[in-house]
Amino acid sequence: MGKRLRQQRRGKGSKAYSKRPGTFDISVNYPYNTKASKEGEVTRLFNHTGHTAPLMEIEYDDFTNGNMIAPEGIKVHDKVYIGKETFTLGSVCRIGDIPEGMPVYNIESTPGDGGKLVRSAGSTAYITAHLSGATNVTLPSRASVVLNDDCRAQLGAVAGGGMTDQPLVKAGKSHYIMHATNRMWPKIRGVKSNPVDHPFGGKQHHKGKSSMTSRNAPPGRKVGHIAASRTGRRKKG
């Protein structure tokens, strides 16, 4: 009897395919009041499992604490400003107030969402143009997006840009990195599996076997191109 497919095991909902408790137990965003003006001091720089970039803990002048993504070059006891037109490293400003050409990160896609774009280690975006009520931002992928002027962003580039310079060397190290973030790894092709693991597996009878599967196929056989009208490139003419 064959084994269950990967999608069957994931759909069951076991701990092996669930988020680890405590992985994202730290809130990393901006203050909810978009009109608030604060001044804070960096009290601690630390790493967290749920983020590739280092984080910084900030103590504000109203005696509250918060966490934000740390920029390259920040250090403990540095001042960080929120809502003020003070363009210092790590400060939070409206993108409509930031001069063109300045590097930014942790950008809000809609005003008040706390930052959704450009958050990974070493990434940075640039303010390229100011339009009527909107701002053009160039992302690390070189794609341009037009965002509301009231969206906020931090100044600088995300720290930790050299995290991928050191090679992994062995598969075991990659194993722990992937499992910390609940990535599906390793992901192998069905034709490289054993016959007991996948309908496309095995060395025999691989040639000429269709990858198309009926819509009414039972679980365990329903893999490949399900009820496809065609496969491959479209024929000309």
Please give the residue ranges for each predicted region.
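Short acidic-glycine loop/turn motifs at beta-strand connectors
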Residues: 60-63, 141
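Beta-strand/loop nucleic-acid-binding surfaces
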Residues: 63-75
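Short, hydrophobic/aromatic-rich beta-strand segments within well-structured domains
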Residues: 56-57, 135
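Basic, glycine/proline-rich low-complexity segments that contact nucleic acids
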Residues: 1-51, 76-237
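Structural recognition of beta-strand segments within beta-rich domains
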Residues: 50-52, 58-60
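Conserved strand-loop elements at the edges of beta-sheets that form or border functional pockets
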Residues: 60, 70, 129
